[in-house]
Every structure is written in C-alpha cells, then in structure tokens.
Amino acid sequence: MGVKTFTHSSSSHSQEMLGKLNMLRNDGHFCDITIRVQDRIFRAHKVVLAACSDFFRTKLVGQTEDENKNVLDLHHVTVTGFIPLLEYAYTATLSINTENIIDVLAAASYMQMFSVASTCSEFMKSSILWNTPNSQPEKGLDAGQENSSNCNFTSRDGSISPVSSECSAVERTIPVCRESRRKRKSYIVMSPESPVKCSTQTNSPQVLNSSASYAENRNQPVDSSLAFPWTFPFGIDRRIQPEKAKQAENTRTLELPGPSEAGRRMADYVTCESTKTTLPLGTEEDVRVKVERLSDEEVHEEVSQPVSASQSSLSDQQTVPGSEPVQEDLLISPQSSSIGSVDEGVTEGLPTLQSTSSTNAHADEDDRLENVQYPYQLYIAPSTSSTERPSPNGPDRPFQCPTCGVRFTRIQNLKQHMLIHSGIKPFQCDCCGKKFTRAYSLKMHRLKHEVIS
C-alpha cells in the first residue's frame, strides 16, 4: 500500500515571515548590521538585505570575521530614497510619491535593486501626476480620468506593481505616439566622407520644414547596427573615420540644406555607415559626436553635437542667459521635467565640435550660452587631473540609469536625468504649438518667431 503524501502550500506564509521580520527589526532584535545614511542610523538584518539587493550581497557575502563590519556607510544614497527601499525589503510594498520618486529611483539603481528601479521608471513615465495650470490639455486625451489615492501600475510583463501614490490632481495619460516623438533630427557630421556645408542663416524660412525629411525616409530599411540609439560617451563614434589633417586644411562653412536635400543626406549616411571600417582607439579625435535616430523616449544625457547659430535655430538648443537655475527638488515643477533632452541640446559640460569657418565670430557667444544651459557641471575628483577624463564605467561614475544605462558621477545628475524618461513637456508655444520641457527653451523658441515675423 502506497504512502499517502499531503502537501500544504500557504500563500500567506511569505507575508507573515516578512511581517515578523519587520517587527523584529523595529524592536531591534537580532539586527546584525547598521546602515548609516547621511548621519542617520538604520538597523537591519544582513540576510534580508543580501536577499533583496545585489549591492548588499556583494558587500556582505564572503567577508571574514576580521573584515566583517557592523556599520556600513552609504555615501551616495539619500535618506529620502533609502527609507522606502528598506521598508520595501521588509514589507514588499513600495510607497513613492512625486517628491521622493527620483531619490528612490537613484538609490535603487545604486543598490542594484533593478526590479524596483524599473517599476519606478515605468511609474514615472506613465503615472506621474503633473499639475501644470499653464499647459493646455492635448487633443485625443481622455478627459474622464478619476482621482485615485492608490495607483496600481501594471508593468510591461503584465504583473501589477503595488505602487501607492498620493494623487492630488487628475491623472494625465501620456499618449504612446505623438508627432513630437516621431521627429528625428539628422545631425550634421563633419567628416571627410561627407563634407557638409552650412551657413549661419537663422531666419531662413526653411527652418520651419526642417523635420519634413523624416517623413520621407521613415520607412526606409535601417542597418541593424544603427537600429538602437547607442551613445559613445568618450571619443567619437567608432563608425566614423575622422582625419585631423583634412579638417584643419578645409575650413567649412555650414549651409542650411532644404528638406529634400537633408532627407537625402541622412538616407545616404544611414546606408553607407555599415561599410565604414573601425579605427583603433589611439587614432580617435578628442571630440564627442553622436549620430543616431532619436525620439523623446530614447534620449541619453551625454550627447555631443556641433554647436552653431543655424543649428540653434533648428532645434532650439540655446538657453537664455541669466535665467533662474533649476532646483534639485522640482519634480513637481515643470521646469525640471526633462533635463538633458536632445531637442533642447542640453549637454553636461562636454566638449563640442566647433566649426572653424565664418562662424568663428559666434564661437564666443555659443560657448557663453552653452556654459549656462546646465546647472550641474561634470564632477571630477580632486585627485584627477583637469585634463583627464573619468572612466565611463569606473568608480568615478557609480550612478547608473536603469532605463538607458547612462552612468553619472553625482546623484543629482542622475536624478535630473531620470526626468527625461517622463516625456512631459508642459510649456507650449502659442504660435506653432511646439512643446518644451523648460521655460527658457520656450523663450528662445519664441525669438525665432519674432525674427521670422
């Protein structure tokens, strides 16, 4: 006679275990590690932290008794971002709001809690509530959204993330496809293979049709190597063959091409990029160039491109001198909703490729405008020489964006970079309806209408 076997499976056992572990932590029982964040002390259990975070598992697993430290300092994490993650480790519930989501996202990325970081990123892109009285509701949006105090967000894989948010305004749905997100910019590359010429005309009527070339070439096949918007943070694109001698001899002036000509050049560039050979690292120029197909959802922070008067009129890349600086905690404020957007040419103090032709008269003005358009400069450790660059993946850049993988040296830079992925552009032009993420970018855009009129 066979032995009967009965298996009991309790769905509430894990929650009960976490609840009891949280009670032990709150009472201070069996806590074997102390976390210090911004001079605040948090008691916890090593086994819980190591099970939730790859960062803590790397720190704690494999240590000998002599090397075992009971106090662990987290220098790159804020208290506002750490407390929700600690509560999540013991309760499996993440409580975020519009004031702490950036801190939580930065802390989760640093602590390598990528599932939490992905949830925060998706929530910020799809469920953040913005209270912008000056912005007009877009056409095609559902006006019958209901107010909710607890928002359950469904991720891409179909799982429901228990994300609670205190909602004080009507939820605003971000459309999946908008005209502004379909626009791609064809960056002008000054290479020997494509000697592009551009004039400094800023009031040309062709500026208004600068994006028409994308509609003509959007259905053309693209090489697989160019299908994803990869950036090359240090050094130029490996697929570009620069020649310093030819660039020094041939002083080029930038000339604004028409819509059809710009589309043809972009198509020719895309088709011939795959045939170019790869250069060794030693022969690269000390410039940073990024040529790719971009949208508002596929934006990276570290973008370098040629800066000239004509291009500033094409994509409104300049900023207004003397404008008020953007504060770090302005997640609710629209002025910081998308810092680093390529549409507005924000860079992180990186070197740019300056033209050596008749636009030299505008070089000083471009440099002056470029220096004021980003409130946070690239931080270099005091031990690093001013002429050296920190490693793109080294300890100088400990903060990584979970959405696009860009790394940063300061937590403030990552916090502001994450605002890009929200896709919110609250400032709209009254003349043409184009939207911007910053007020001063809208001011510069209005100057173009004044010049044309």
Swiss-Prot record:
Keywords: DNA-binding, Isopeptide bond, Metal-binding, Nucleus, Phosphoprotein, Repeat, Transcription, Transcription regulation, Ubl conjugation, Zinc, Zinc-finger. SUPFAM superfamilies: beta-beta-alpha zinc fingers, POZ domain. Gene3D superfamilies: Classic Zinc Finger, Potassium Channel Kv1.1, Chain A. Residues 241-265, 295-324, 336-368 are annotated as: Disordered. Residues 304-318 have a biased composition (Low complexity). GO terms for molecular function: DNA binding; zinc ion binding. The modification Phosphoserine is found at S135, S159, S161, S165, S191, S194, S199. The keyword Nucleus applies. It comes from the Eukaryota. It is found in: Nucleus. InterPro entries: BTB/POZ_dom, SKP1/BTB/POZ_sf, Znf_C2H2_sf, Znf_C2H2_type, ZnFinger_BTB_dom_contain. The keyword Transcription regulation applies. GO terms for cellular component: nucleus. The modification Phosphothreonine is found at T200. Its main location: nucleus. Residues 352-361 have a biased composition (Polar residues). Residues 31-98 form the BTB domain. This is Zinc finger and BTB domain-containing protein 44. It comes from Rattus norvegicus. The gene is Zbtb44.
